[in-house]
Regions:
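Short, basic (Lys/Arg/His-rich) helix/loop patches that form interaction surfaces
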Residues: 48, 62-133, 137
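Structural detector for helix-capping/boundary residues
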Residues: 4, 9-12, 90, 116, ...
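Short functional hotspots where side chains directly engage DNA or cofactors
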Residues: 18-23, 109, 120-121, 132-150, ...
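C-terminal secondary-structure termini that scaffold catalytic or DNA-interacting sites
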Residues: 18, 27-54, 60, 67-71, ...
Length: 171
C-alpha cells in the first residue's frame, strides 16, 4: 500500500472474517486541512488479502485504541494521533528514520518497504498479476518493470531450469 492509503485506513475497511483490507481512499494534507481523497487512480481501489500476523497485530491495535478511547467520533482511523487526527506522512517518515538509526539499520525511505514487499512476493513466486493488483497498478507490465529486480539466486535458478529441460535432468 502507498503511505497515503494506509494512513487513510478506517476500521470499517477491514473485513476480519475474510482477512482483507479494502483500499478505498487516501489521506493527505491540502491547504492546511486533511483531505480524504479518492485513491491515486481507479485501479488503486482494491481489496488486499492480509497475512495472519498482520490481522493479529491490527486486532491488538484496535483493542488498545478502544481501551484508550482513541476511536473518536468521525475519526475511526487505524493510524491516528492521540487526538484522533490523521498522521502526516512526513511525521511518520521522520520517526521511521529515527527507528532505523537507533536499530543500526541502513537508511531507507518508508516507501522502500513497498518496493521490498513487491520484490519479495515476486521472488517467492507470487503471480505478477496478483502483486500488481495488491499494489494497485494499472498494468502488470508496470509492476514488473518497477519491482522485478533480478536477484542473484534467480539467475542460478534460471540456468538450472534451462539445463534440466535441455538435458532431461531434475532442476
Amino acid at each position: 500500500m502507498r503511505p497515503s492509503e494506509y494512513l487513510g485506513l478506517k476500521w470499517q475497511d477491514i473485513d476480519w472474517t475474510r482477512q482483507t483490507v479494502s483500499v478505498v481512499r487516501s489521506v493527505r494534507r491540502l491547504d492546511g486541512r486533511w483531505c480524504f481523497c479518492d485513491t491515486k487512480r481507479s485501479q488503486s481501489r482494491r481489496p488486499i488479502k492480509l497475512q495472519r500476523w498482520i490481522v493479529a497485530l491490527l486486532r491488538d491495535v484496535q483493542t488498545k485504541a478502544s481501551a484508550h478511547s482513541l476511536c473518536l467520533e468521525g475519526r475511526d482511523l487505524v493510524f491516528k494521533t492521540a487526538s484522533g487526527h490523521p498522521i502526516h506522512a512526513d511525521y511518520l517518515a521522520k520517526h521511521f528514520k529515527m527507528i532505523l538509526e537507533l536499530a543500526g539499520l541502513p537508511r531507507i525511505r518508508l516507501y522502500d518497504l513497498r518496493h521490498s514487499a513487491a520484490t519479495i512476493a515476486l521472488a517467492a513466486g507470487v503471480s505478477p498479476k496478483v502483486v500488481s493488483e495488491q499494489l494497485g497498478h494499472a498494468s502488470t507490465a508496470f509492476t514488473l518493470d518497477t519491482y522485478a529486480h533480478v536477484l542473484p539466486h534467480m539467475q542460478d535458478e534460471a540456468a538450472a531450469r534451462i539445463e534440466a529441460i535441455l538435458f532431461g535432468e531434475k532442476a
